[in-house]
Every structure is written in structure tokens, then in C-alpha cells.
Amino acid sequence: WIRTTFIDFPVDKYSLDSGLDLDSTGTFDMVYSTDNYGTVLIDNNDKAHIFTGNMRYLDDDLADGVSSWFPLTNGLLYWNEDMGADTTLPTPQDSDLWYSETPIVIAQARDLNCDIEVAGYDSTGGYALYYASLSSMPSAGITSSGDIYVTFSAYTEDVDNSIQVFRHVNIIRSLDGGATWSEPIDITPHDIWNGQQECVFASMVK
């Protein structure tokens, strides 16, 4: 076996309440990582493809025993073996913000009402609590001809019951081994319910 690190967290064996100040400015840094929902696909050429939800974290209270996560974080991350190991330096890329430069975002929960943000009735609380990105819970499969399909659960901002915004399963595909990806399609519209069905944890036959 050969181990490859596709997101190299900037501090090895980080302990909660230690505080991350990577550039020693006196301000704790926010970091991007995964949301702990992911899947691995081995293609027909035995190449690994990884899909995972994106998430921001901040540990700025050094006495509470937990870190903060940000539920409005969006983006489905993608990596394959051709991209190589993560070599991102352990210093912030932007002011007090670190993120890996290796995985790429291939899909997101969409701005369906065109107000330049993805948010709804439950954006300040009351949302279904999965501790997940707005685009998360991926599942992937591949055809005999090498076409890759990926489903993910997407926050669907224009479908709500005035309390909760619902998630729907979206699907994307790549016809060129992961180089480019299609636009997402909602495959669980549930029109008969005005879309008000929570669609999560889809599973695709590999």
C-alpha cells in the first residue's frame, strides 16, 4: 500500500483548545477541511477518486473543549491520484484563513433564488443538523465505459416549510475521467410534495 495525503492539515495531531495562529498575528486562524462525509471510487484503470464535503472550522475559545463549524459552508471537494499529494504550506493563504490547494470544488448547493448567497429560513438555526456542508454526503459510481457519476445531498434553498429548508439529492457526471463535470441535476424533486422531502445519504451502485 502507498499512502497519499490529499489534504494535509497544517498542524499535526492538533489538540482542541490549542488555538491555531499559523502566522503568529495574535488572531486565531480559520481552516478549511472536510466535513467528515466522503466516498472513494476506484475507476476502471485502478485510479482512486475522492469526493467529500467542504467545511470551515475555528477553535477560538480555548476553554470550551470544542471547535466551531460553519453550516453555510458550501462545496463538494474532489481529488484524484493524478493531482498528487497535498503540498500546501502551513501558513494562511488569505488573512487568517487556511485551505488546501489540492482538492478542487466540482459542485455546490445552488443559488436558486439568485440573491448571491445560498441560505434560507433556517440559516440562523433550526436546520437539519448533520454537521455537513451545504453540498455533502457524496456517493460515486462508474460505468463500463469510464463515465463517473456522483450524487450528493444539496441544501435546496427555495424548498421550505417556513421552518426548515430541505435537502435534495443532486447528480453530476464526468465523461473525461474527472477533468470536467456537468452541472448538478436534482433527481429527487418530489413535486407532489412541493419538494418538501428531506433527501440525504443516497447510495449509488459502484
Where are these regions (language model features)?
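Extracellular, repeat-based ectodomains that mediate carbohydrate processing or recognition
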Residues: W1-K206
